[in-house]
Curated annotation (Swiss-Prot):
GO terms for biological process: rRNA processing. The gene is mrnC. Belongs to the MrnC RNase family. This is Mini-ribonuclease 3. It is found in: Cytoplasm.
Length: 138
């Protein structure tokens, strides 16, 4: 996913890591969830398919179970600071949907929190990590 240095949605400024850490983990996860779904939609758009097929592929790829798997694959690449952001996100995970185990939901929330945090304060690192994640039709 192309993450521009200057983003009209974020403004022309990045937050400092200290400022981004002041945001609630749930807020960062909310942002990270939207970013990851957008990333998957961009990656699955081509080759051209019917919109229903693209939608089904995206839904499968952004499920919490899949995000939990992706987080596990990223863990060796994360810095101590990033691992702390993931931990904060996991610990802040709210009510778990019935179809999920708490562990999957917490891990998915941890990944989303990290993505939201990096979007706000380190877009190059966000892009580097997103490139490490395989986007497959699930």
């Amino acid at each position: 996913m192309f993450v521009p240095e200057s983003d009209p949605l974020r403004g022309d400024r990045r937050l400092s890591p200290a400022a981004a850490k002041q945001l609630a983990p749930q807020a960062l996860a909310y942002l990270g969830d939207a970013l990851y779904e957008f990333h998957v939609r961009l990656r699955l758009l081509l080759p051209a398919q019917r919109s229903h097929q693209v939608h089904q592929s995206v839904v499968g790829a952004v499920r919490a179970e899949r995000q939990a798997e992706l987080l596990v694959s990223l863990l060796p690449l994360l810095t101590a600071e990033e691992l702390e952001i993931v931990r904060r996100g996991r610990n802040a995970a709210g009510r778990v949907p019935r179809r999920l185990t708490g562990e999957y939901y917490q891990q998915a929330t941890g990944l989303e929190t990290l993505l939201g945090y990096l979007y706000l304060c380190d877009p190059q690192r966000l892009q580097a990590l997103l490139q490490q994640l395989p986007v497959t039709e699930y």
